[in-house]
Amino acid sequence: MHTHRLDLDDPTVREWDATVLQASPEDGIVLDRSAFYPGGGGQPPDEGVLLWGGVRTRIVGTRKGDEQYLLPAEGDPLPPAGTAVRGALDDERRTALMRTHSGLHVLCGVVFRDYGALVTGGNMEPLTARMDFDMTEVPPDFRDRVAEACNAEIARDRRIEVSTLPREEAFKIPDIIRTATNLVPPEVEIVRIVDIVGLDTQADGGTHVASTAMIGRIEVTKLENKGRGFRRIRIAIT
């Protein structure tokens, strides 16, 4: 039995009931239902707690494998298999990561629309992030232009919609892959699509806010020339 991904069903879930399927010091804890985002696509995993029988087990990370393994803090007790637990995410961290991830999609959409550049890499932490683009040249006022355009899109309060499509159908959507290399594994038959309506549509597995107005404001903190025609844009969400 695999973990049911509540984070994919509804990214606003912060607390839920679950049953422990397995637990070991070597592998971690596997639940039948979990809202912990396991990490991937540049988005770090969630953190939080499991509450059971008056005990509190802190979850500080995840490990990928055949199952979604939750990693407890060192020294915290493990709930035995079969234990009913109450899961709770670190709400501040998750919400910040959702805002940041959606902000990166706005940035990606603006740079692709205005400059035709594809993404070559990226990473994020709560409220800060960087994204690399395949760009040989940029205008002198590029940094200000990008920030202004991103915040204009945020102010439009565009809806952010999530859907799934069969792989063959998804890849018929123009420019559905915004990275220079297709990062969707070949074994993935159902592709998750994140659509900032009217701006950016791409394959993505992360968690997002419901509209661009919920992101806040994007500040372009730094523009770096990484050589070989790559430009790195660093942002902060405020």
What are these regions (language model features)?
Residues M1-T238:
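Active-/binding-site microenvironments in catalytic and ligand-binding cores
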